[in-house]
Amino acid sequence: MRTFLLFLLICAESFAQAPSTGLQGSVQQDHLVASIVTRLQISREVAWTKFQNHTPVADLAREAAILTALKSEGRKIGLTEDQVSALFVPQIAASRRAQEELIAGWRFGSPRPTTPPKDLQREIRPLVTKISLELLQEWKDLPPQSLSTTFRKDAEKQIIAKGFSPDVARIAASPLGKG
């Protein structure tokens, strides 16, 4: 129940505060960006747990397994493996980068969370899976003509506004348009 409430809180915050892109299809774009932000916010919990447990951020086997599972789920809804990879390879990289930045900051004296770390297996990973499946559907539903440099730049601004670095924002928003 605690995990579900955490997920609802993160989602509500992301959707309530996601500014409109002002572009054609903006509702779909806003939902996609809000889900990207939610996934990144969950990465903060992952980072805190890994920091407290002295676990390395990079877990290439886990990342490969996630991508394989998402490709399988993507096929079920009509996406190609390339379409799934186009969205999720950058999302996984952005998550990893956000975790690395947070952990480096904590090691060098940035304020640390005051809450105890959550259980990676039982609490955090189910949230990552849930939001990733939502992202898959939103990616499928997004009209291809919505992808543009303007959309990508707007998404970067929204991600930065949620407290992520320009580097994380650039990586996470990269599938949304050329640039």
Q: Where do the protein language model's features map onto the residues?
A:
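Glycine-rich, aromatic-bearing surface loops/beta-hairpins
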Residues: W139-G179
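Boundary at the C-terminal end of the N-terminal hydrophobic targeting segment
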Residues: S14-A18
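Mid-length scaffold segments of soluble, non-membrane domains
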Residues: K76-T114
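Immediate post-signal-peptide N-terminus of mature secreted/exported proteins
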Residues: S20-A61
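Extended amphipathic alpha-helical interaction segments
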Residues: R107-L142
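Sec-dependent N-terminal signal peptides
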Residues: T3-A12
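Amphipathic alpha-helical segments within well-ordered protein domains
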Residues: A47, K71-R75
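Secondary-structure edge/capping motif, primarily at the C-terminal ends of alpha-helices
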Residues: K50-H54, G109, L142, S146
